[in-house]
A protein has these predicted regions:
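Boundary-proximal intrinsically disordered activation/regulatory segments immediately upstream
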Residues: 1-63
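Generic secondary-structure transition motif, activating predominantly at the C-termini of alpha-helices
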Residues: 14-21, 68, 86-89
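A generic structural signal for short, non-catalytic loop/turn and secondary-structure boundary residues
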Residues: 24, 45, 67-70, 89-91
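Structural motif
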Residues: 28, 48-50, 73-75, 92-96
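Fold-independent oxyanion-binding glycine-rich loops
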Residues: 34, 54, 77-79, 98-100
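Short, glycine- and charge-enriched coil/turn segments that flank and shape catalytic ligand pockets
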Residues: 44, 55-73, 102-106
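A glycine-rich helix N-cap at a beta->alpha junction
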Residues: 66-87
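Hydrophobic alpha-helical segments and helix pairs
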Residues: 81-106
Length: 106
């Protein structure tokens, strides 16, 4: 379990949340919430990492297990770390770092 805000994965997420330049350079962005992570899993998105905490719903936990079985890097974090990363008032307990699609926009 990740409990420190100084962890390299936490620093990556914070950078992606904070600066457009970081997202562009990394080719990644952050999706937060059970529904967004679920939709990304159904789609053709490439996951870099999924972070979740103990407040995650049963539906979300099912999603985490499915992603773990697919070989996605899934990490549990403390509730305080998740709250520090969350962009919402009441975090849903899950977020994912996804790679931008390589498909050209027509």
């Amino acid at each position: 379990m990740i409990t420190s805000n100084q962890n390299s994965k936490i620093k990556l997420v914070r950078a992606l949340l904070g600066r457009t330049k970081e997202r562009r350079e990394a080719g990644s962005f952050v999706a937060e919430g059970v529904r967004l992570v679920e939709e990304a899993a159904k789609g053709d998105w490439r996951f870099e990492i999924v972070l979740y905490d103990e407040t995650l719903s049963e539906r979300g936990r099912s999603q985490v297990e499915g992603l773990r079985l697919k070989g996605v890097d899934v990490e549990e974090v403390s509730a305080s770390v998740m709250k520090s990363l969350s962009d919402t008032e009441s975090p849903q307990g899950i977020l994912a770092v996804l790679k931008f699609s390589q498909s050209p926009i027509i």
